[in-house]
Structures are given as structure tokens and as C-alpha cells.
């Protein structure tokens, strides 16, 4: 069962985000031990794992997440999410229509990216558990990231969807999280703030203070 508190500190990463001196398992384990509330496996880019290698890694990471009682979401790959029985799926505006697969994800978490009011108005949220809003700030983690919308987009969306779970994403770090909290987000999604942190435990606990 989805709870908006699971969005508090939502960690996203794939092998492409991990520093060369670490493994994805090591980084995720540190983040889980520190208290992340949700994990999304997002394997993208020219050197991304594919096929069986991607599936085996996803299974390993799901098992790791479950050992800490944290759900694991798969980004964009509906087939993989089904094959590994992931806890949910997150899709973007240009990905598969949610109505096409929602029936296969009953009792699972479904997330949708929403970048602005126009995208919100074009989106059917009837099968969606939460929306990821952003990018908040300039980000280097996504090559195809659009122009930042800023934290104010959260409060603009709140005028239409008062209690709907919203997680902020894009360029978020320890120095700029406060405005996102002030605007009413239920949590933050981060990639590099954790993968590039010199002290993952300290970073995650810092973020958690804002949402607990």
C-alpha cells in the first residue's frame, strides 16, 4: 500500500550514476542504512546494462531494498518491472500510456513525471499514486532534462491537486532543499546528491529532517 511518506527521501540511480571507485550495490546499501524511503532503479544511457544483466542486477537491488523494508520502483521499463515483480513503475510524459499497463500493476506504486501545468492538465491521474515534479533546478544527472521550473511549480500544482502526493526532482542538494519544503512537496527525489556524497549517511539524514 502506497503512503506519501515513502516519498520523503526518494533515491534514484543506475550504474551510470555511480562513481568509478564504488559499486551500485555499495551506494544503495549505504543509502538504505541511512534511511532512504523509496528507491528507483533507473538504468539509462549509452553504457547502461541491458537484457539479462540488467534484470539480474535489478533483482539483486530489489532484494537489498526489501531487506530494509524499502520499496523498489523501476523507471520506464514496464516489462522489467513485471519480470522482477517490482513494487512499482515510474513513467515520463513521453513513455507508455499508464492506462495501457495500469491493470497489470494493481496494488503497485505508479508514478508519473509532470513538468508544468500543461502536462498536468493533459495527464490522467486516476491510476497514478504520485507525481514527480521538476526539474526544480539545473541538473547534470539527466542529459535530456528540460528547463528548470523552480519550487514554485509545486504550489502552483497544489491549487489544482491539494492533497495529491508530489515529489520534487532535479538538481536538489543540501543547499536548496528548503524552498521545496516551503512550497509543499511531500518529498524529494535525488540522484547525485547521494551518489556523489562523501558521507551518504549524513546527507540522507539531513534530508530526512525536513520530512519527518
UniProtKB/Swiss-Prot annotation:
Mg(2+) binds at residues 76, 95. It catalyses: 2-[(2R,5Z)-2-carboxy-4-methylthiazol-5(2H)-ylidene]ethyl phosphate + 4-amino-2-methyl-5-(diphosphooxymethyl)pyrimidine + 2 H(+) = thiamine phosphate + CO2 + diphosphate; 2-(2-carboxy-4-methylthiazol-5-yl)ethyl phosphate + 4-amino-2-methyl-5-(diphosphooxymethyl)pyrimidine + 2 H(+) = thiamine phosphate + CO2 + diphosphate; 4-methyl-5-(2-phosphooxyethyl)-thiazole + 4-amino-2-methyl-5-(diphosphooxymethyl)pyrimidine + H(+) = thiamine phosphate + diphosphate. Pathway: Cofactor biosynthesis; thiamine diphosphate biosynthesis; thiamine phosphate from 4-amino-2-methyl-5-diphosphomethylpyrimidine and 4-methyl-5-(2-phosphoethyl)-thiazole: step 1/1. Binds 1 Mg(2+) ion per subunit. GO terms for cellular component: cytoplasm. Its EC number is 2.5.1.3. It comes from the Bacteria. Keywords: Magnesium, Metal-binding, Thiamine biosynthesis, Transferase. Belongs to the thiamine-phosphate synthase family. HAMAP family: TMP_synthase. Condenses 4-methyl-5-(beta-hydroxyethyl)thiazole monophosphate (THZ-P) and 2-methyl-4-amino-5-hydroxymethyl pyrimidine pyrophosphate (HMP-PP) to form thiamine monophosphate (TMP). This is Thiamine-phosphate synthase.
